[in-house]
Amino acid sequence: AQHSDVLVEETDVLAKLRKVRLQVGGGDWFSFCPDKGRDEKWRMSALLTADKGHDHHRACDCGVVICHGTQLTVLYVDLKSSNPVGYAGQFKSTRQFVRYALGLSEEFHGSPLRLERGQYVVLYGGAKPLPIPKRPTVRKFGTAGKTQTDKAFKREVPNDARVYLRELLG
C-alpha cells in the first residue's frame, strides 16, 4: 500500500518549525529529501565549485514528484522558522538536481519523462499555533498560483501542521 502523507522535516536543531505533513493521497508520485543526500561537507557534489557566491550546494527540505503520463510536476518545499527569505538558491540547486536526474534517465534508459512544471513553496512559522477563529468557519488560505524560485508561494503554519498537496499546487 502506498503512503498518503509526506513528512517534511527541518534538520536544524534550532529551527522553530521542525516538521509538516503534506497530505498527498494515492497516485503516481514519490518524495525525496535533497538535504539528506549531500556529503559530510554539505556539498551536492565534490565536482562543483564551493566558493562564495555559488548556491549550488544548497538544498530545499523536500521534493515531491508527481507523474501524469510522461509529464512531471515537481513540488519543492522549504521550511523556514520566521522570516521566509533566502530560499531561492535552495530551490535552484534542487531544481538542477532534478533536471540532472531526468537527463541521466533519458541518456541511459531513453526515458520520455519531461518536467512540465515546478512549484516552489515556503512553509514558515512554527513558534505558536495559528489563532482559532471565534466563530466556526473553515479557514481560507491563499491559493498557490504560478511560482518561481525567487517568488515562492508562502504560507504560515504551526509545527506538526497537515497541509493538502493540492492547495500548494494551485
What is each residue range found by the language model?
Residues 50, 54, 78-86:
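Short coil/turn segments at secondary-structure boundaries
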Residues 1-22:
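N-terminal "first-domain core" detector
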Residues 16, 20-68:
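Active-site metal-binding core of divalent-cation-utilizing nuclease and nuclease-like domains
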Residues 109-170:
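Domain-level recognition of nuclease-like catalytic cores that cleave nucleotide substrates
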Residues 62-64, 73-81:
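Conserved catalytic cores of phosphodiester-cleaving nucleases, focusing on short active-site segments
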Residues 65-73, 124-128:
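Short, flexible beta-strand-to-coil junctions
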